Amino acid sequence: MDLNKQLKKYAQLIAKVGLNVQEGQPVLVRASTETREFVAKVVEACYELGAKRVSVEWRDQELTKLNLKYQSEESLSTVGQWYIDKYQDELDEGAAFLSIIGDDPDGLAGVDSAKLKASMVGRSKAMRNYMKSIMSDECPWCVVSASTVGWAKRLYPELDDEAAYLKLWDQILSACRSTGDDPVAEWEEHIKVLDEKAKFLHENELVKLHITNDLGTDLYVGLPKNHIWQSAGSYAKKADRFVANIPTEEVFTMPHKDETSGIVYNAKPLNYSGVLIDNFWLKFEEGKVVDFGAERGYDVLKNLLETDEGSRRIGEMALVPYDSPISNTKILFLETLFDENAACHIALGKAYPTCVQGGPEMTDEQLAEVGANDSLVHVDFMIGEATTNITGYTADGKEVAIFRDGNWA
C-alpha cells in the first residue's frame, strides 16, 4: 500500500468523522512524540476543515518514566493551575479534543506503583471538570491511535523495527476501516448498523443482564431506570455528531452502581497506564468489588481499586461480538482502544451521564440517585470471548437472548 496516501485518508477520517471539526473551531491534540509525522497530517486535516487553530500537547514515555523515578509522590500528584486553566479555556471556546495513543503497552513496567497511583489520582482530581465535560459530551472528543516502534515491537518482536512499525500501521488502518476508497462513507454505514443494535436493546427496556462464559464468569448486572444504549455516534452540545473512538464496534450503557453481583474473569490483558494486568478476577456484591486476584499486575490492580469509593464499582457495560473485525485479526493489541472492540467489556469507575435520560443536565447527586457511578477513573477491561452468553431480563421477568456463543443472538 501507499502508506503516505493511506495515512492522509486516516487523518481526514479522524478530523471529519471522529472530531467533525467545524469552521472556526479550535482543536487540542494530545500525542506521543513518536507520532510526530502522523500528527502533522491530522493537524493539516483539521485546518482543511476550517479549524481556527490546532494546538498540540506532546508527551514522551521515556520522560514520564524519569519523572516517576525521580519526583516525589507529592510532586507527581500536583498539577499546576495554568494547566487546568488551559483546558478550561479550550472548553469555554468550544474546542474539539483529540488523543492519539501509541506508547509501548508495557513501557512503564517496573515503576513504583505508589508513585504511578499518585500521578494518576493527582491528574484525575485536577482535571475533574474537564473529564465531566468530556463524559457528558459537552464537546467533541475522539481517541485514536498511531503506530510506534515501541508498541509494534511489543506485538511483533520477531520483526525488525521498520517491518514491525509498518505491520502495525497495516493492522491499525484495517481495524479502523480506513483502507478503502472512501473511509468516511464506510463509517456512515457502520454507524447505522450499530445504531440498529442500540435501538433493539433500548426497545426491550431491560432491567438486568446475566453474563456467563467458560472462563468462569457468572455475573448479574442491573440497569437503571431510563438507561440509554449508546453506539458509535455522539452529539455534542455545541456541534454536530462526532465519534469518540476510532475504531469502535460497541454498543454500551450505564449499569446501576449498586446492582452488580457475581464473579467476572478478564478475557484479555488490561494495559493500565503502561503496566499490564492479566489473569485477574473480581467478585462483586451489591455493586462493589469485595474480593479480587491477579497473576500479573496485582499491586497496580489493587491501587486502581483503591483509588476512591467508585473505583470498586462499574460505570459501563459494553457489548461487542466475538465475530468482529478486530477480534478476527486474532491479534492482542495490548491497548484498550483496540482490545475493548474485540470483546464485551465493563469499566471500573465513572459512568457516562449520556447513558441515562437527562443525565448530562443532572447534578452529581441526581446522577447518584438514579444509579450512576462516580469516580476519578474509568478503566475498561475485556470479559467477552467465544463462549460468552448474555441474557437480558425485563421488569416482568421475560428473558431476552442478547448474545449466544460470543455473538449477537
Language-model-detected regions and their locations in the chain:
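Active-site bordering "gate/hinge" segments
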Residues: 1-261, 392, 398-400, 408
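Short solvent-exposed loop/turn micro-motifs enriched in small/polar/acidic residues
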Residues: 12, 202-204, 273-275, 310, ...
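A short secondary-structure junction signal
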Residues: 109-112, 153-157, 232-234, 275-278, ...
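Short linear motifs in exposed loops
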Residues: 222, 292-293, 403
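Long, well-ordered mid-to-C-terminal structural blocks that present hydrophobic/aromatic surfaces
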Residues: 251-309
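Active-site lining segments that contact anionic ligands and/or coordinate catalytic metals
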Residues: 259-261, 277-279, 286-289, 312-316, ...
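Dual-mode signal for accessory low-complexity, basic/Gly-rich regions
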Residues: 291-360
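Extended hydrophobic packing segments that form well-structured cores
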Residues: 365-409
